[in-house]
């Protein structure tokens, strides 16, 4: 994968931030927030800042073109490296660097920037052979064609892979008479019709297209629920119902993260939505519904993206803890150093896992370069515990200082002189100290911080399930042999 700098003469498919924003106006999407129908996020004060952040993400690839763009294998135009199917260890390393740059722009707070699904569909297209099983050659061809469209149009996409939580003790087809979960209700020569709901479409207000693919196994008799496809956000019959916004026209001083990085989550309603068959990847194949996740290498590739972002987010947390401890002078205490050391351990173990996965990577049977997923399987069980625990450590490092945080209106108001005197710290003046503590509180204690903690606990499934799975699939031969050598000794 060659990389290149952009110039005015360099053909590129990579969009700018302005092109991204213009693209959001191109459809009649139906986004609902607090009972209000919204057609464009820039037109709504609670969504506008995150739209601008997303535009910044698109601009970033041009500012770092040498690291984030590479020639398309089809026509040589420059595209984001996360769109490309990795064919070498170097491709994985370059992809990680591009993901890291994107994550750094949002302190790792936005988990669903476009690189997430770019990596997913590059993986899917690279293993079209898995999608083609049991006579689904057309679905496989559609996956390949759609991935090229994502790449060449530089789309921002969202996905929704779980059905609503009606009665988790039952299969989807038996919950609410089978009418709530997304399912096929009709078919013509050119399209299928789907009805039901899915959750959660993170990034929905800022996406060009919605993708649907498997999130869990499905019973053989539930073929109407075994679906994978992609459609534009403005497709008739699609409705996106958002949770509360955490932006709320907040000051970037008072809420430096919430004001900019709320990527939003939405439930998707499909009101007899027509899906063109050239956008249909899988329909009715309940075996394939599992295999396109288990046999394409998706888990290893998506964990490569996820833990790169987690590395950045953990590094940000380490920076917060380090600066708070030095600002207030508590860094001299051993128990504070121990807490900071714990965060550093998490940062370094995550970095080491990424490097190890790349160093042990190899070519899979489909010709895609696949990261060694063993380090990722270990991290997948621990990361949902680490990130919430980091919040606890930061609380213990900052203590009551998180409550001594006047707003920017106070700092600029009639009490400015007193605030400057009484809010100073050993290592910073009052304004810097207040900025730092408000930033950290937005990370650990605001509504965005709470959403982030919940997200980190569950977005790659829950910790106990992943830890149990890691044990189940782990190679235990060497460990077992160490014990067997003693058990098989002749008594002396």
Positions of PLM-derived features:
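Glycine-rich flavin
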Residues: 70-209, 215-229, 234, 239
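N-terminal low-complexity or amphipathic/hydrophobic leaders
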Residues: 39-103, 365, 459-461, 470
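Generic structural signal for well-ordered, non-transmembrane alpha-helical segments
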Residues: 48, 52, 148-151, 312-315, ...
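Short, charged, amphipathic alpha-helical segments
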Residues: 337-341, 369-377
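N-terminal-proximal low-complexity accessory segments that begin disordered
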Residues: 3-58
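Extended amphipathic alpha-helical segments enriched in small hydrophobics
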Residues: 305-363
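FAD-binding core of flavoproteins
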Residues: 159, 164-306, 471, 475-491
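Alpha-helix capping/hinge segments and adjacent helical runs
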Residues: 374-492
